[in-house]
Design a protein with these regions (language model features):
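Acidic/histidine-rich helix-loop elements
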Residues: 24-44, 90, 114-128, 155-158, ...
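Active-site-proximal beta-strand elements of phosphoester/diester hydrolases
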Residues: 19-31, 95, 107-112, 145-155
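Active-site neighborhood of phospho(di)ester-bond hydrolases with catalytic His/Asp-centered motifs
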Residues: 58-61, 82-83, 184-188, 207-210
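Bacterial N-terminal signal peptides
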Residues: 1-8
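Structured beta-strand-rich core segments of catalytic domains in phosphoester-bond hydrolases
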Residues: 57-148, 243-250
Length: 272
């Protein structure tokens, strides 16, 4: 793939020592035949968005191995963890977590499947696809504070899979975070926030869109301009942070592309 033609002049993020900037980005699977919206046309704009926004961490949904490798190559200073959902290695979509090596240290990570057998590649309940969640224990280098980050993509068909997948994530959070460190959960949840499947999540975590001092209520699924304007199905949840000053749906064009995916990326700044 060709290198990016133009990148923002400054690649190093300037951040307050207690801030974490996170992005959730359903990148749209790279094998989809979307005409001029296919990956072959929009891949430079995806990298441009990351380098422009300069997050400390970001989570991808629907990313194939070659998309992950492309962003690692062209988003200077970022490294990722995650596995393909089909085989636990490279095949299928990755729920990758990227981190900025200048601001963030990776301590440990893992992936589990949203199924009755979460420790091996498997499809759960009434799901149409294998579904996973990737988690990481990270350390903010500026403040020295540790936190957990979970990135996921719930099923687009099965309501039981969404309900039970959500419960499994909540249960796993308790297991992997016994000390109650700050926690961030991002993803494409394939349902709106008024669904009862979110009830347990609402009790334990805050929704950045609703809590931020500066926010918006823009749709997150755009369907290449054809989606319902109320399609808010991507979320950033958090707990253990003192505040969320900014939440934003990233709708600005990059490299003259109105859409860099069929979902808009979303971002939030969280303060310890």
């Amino acid at each position: 793939m060709a290198a990016l033609m133009i990148l923002p002049a400054s690649m190093s993020a300037r951040k307050k020592s207690s801030d974490i900037k996170v992005i959730s980005y359903n990148i749209r699977l790279g094998v989809a035949k979307d005409g001029t919206n296919s990956w072959e046309y929009r891949y430079p704009a995806s990298a441009m968005m990351i380098m422009d926004q300069k997050p400390d961490i970001f989570g991808l949904q629907e990313a194939y191995d070659f998309q992950v490798k492309y962003l690692e190559e062209y988003c200077e200073g970022y490294k990722s963890v995650g596995v393909g959902r089909e085989d636990g290695k490279h095949e299928g979509e990755h729920m990758s977590i990227f981190y900025n090596k200048k601001t963030t240290k990776l301590l440990k990570w893992g992936t589990f499947w949203l199924s009755e057998t979460p420790d091996k590649p498997s499809m759960g309940w009434d799901a149409a696809c294998f579904r996973t969640a990737t988690w990481a224990l990270l350390k903010d280098k500026a403040s020295g504070k540790k936190y957990y980050y979970v990135n996921t993509h719930l099923d687009h068909v099965g309501w039981e899979a969404r309900k039970n997948g959500m419960k499994l994530i909540v249960d796993r959070i308790d297991n992997i975070n016994p000390k109650g460190l700050p926690m961030i959960v991002t993803g494409d949840f394939n349902m709106t926030y008024d669904r009862p499947e979110f009830d347990d999540r609402k009790k334990m975590m805050k929704n950045a869109r609703e809590e931020a001092a500066k926010t918006d209520h823009h749709q997150t699924f755009n369907g290449w301009g054809k989606a319902n304007p109320n399609s808010i199905i991507d979320f950033i949840f958090y707990k253990g942070f003192s505040s969320c000053p900014v939440y934003e749906t990233i709708t600005k064009p990059y490299m003259e592309r109105k859409f860099i995916s069929d979902h808009y990326p979303i971002t939030a700044t969280l303060v310890f």
